[in-house]
Amino acid sequence: LPPLLALLLVAPGATPQRNPFAGRRLYVDPASPAARQAAAWNRSRPADAARMRVIAAQPQAKWMGDWARDVRREVDGVVGAAARQGALPVLVAYNIPHRDCGLYSAGGARDGDGYRRWIRDFAAGINRRPAVVIVEPDGLPSLDCLPLRLQDERYVLLRDAVQTLKAAGAAVYVDAGNANWRRPPDMAGRLRKAGIEMADGFSLNVSNFHAVQVNVTYGEQLSRLVGGKHFVVDTSRNGRGNAVERQWCNAPNQALGRAPTTQTGSALADAFLWVKTPGQSDGTCNGGPRAGEWWADYALELSKAAEAIGSMLPH
């Protein structure tokens, strides 16, 4: 959108907000799982290697959690590599205590104090260099599984994370689940308790499959309830836009979605991103390996489907 039109379309009463992605190229990891798979298949399966290169060519977020032995060093490595490319990295903080309600991606920091230390190490790795951080996918919409005491703690921890990451110079988006999870007034209340006023905005559809327009409509509704805050949408696997209720884990019959872009068609949507790594398993469901492990067959299925229907292109 032209800058003037973008300003005119901002929610009434909201302060026009800078898009941290504007004019920036996003970081592409040359050693991503898809890039390594393409190299492994280059001679034996050249057509499939080419499909892996389609995935590898796209900028994708780097996730940090309790598997990172030294989160400061790992974040520093990603942010430094991006700086050498002249690019903007997108990182995901995924280490909240009682993560994923004990399901496929269970884990996280042992307690609140451990999380505070971890998020400070994460922020130290950024060290006031350009970076975007998605804060705790599903952490807000799923907190009903916790007793009230731990719900209150989670809000405190998320507010602290937002404040700490902003102080390190990052652009911060607090995760707000997906359009079919929580109604906008409910989600807005959760975001306010989690410090959305300090953040750049919120993220939608992380690791999910809901259509772009469904997310944009929901995001615009939610934005109006949180002071006009902007949002980003994960389009990594929503090319078919046919999310089925309770089929969020390695859902079959999906496709790669829109390639990352700031050309979203909405003044409130800062970017479409690939937050989820296509081919990274959601868990031991629908034939997949453990959560977070690379699953080449699923990545190939997503790429083949996108090739057939053109779902990575604007539409």
Q: What is each stretch, according to the model?
A:
Residues 25-28, 61-65, 88-93, 131-136, ...:
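Structural recognition of the beta-strand scaffold that forms the well-ordered cores
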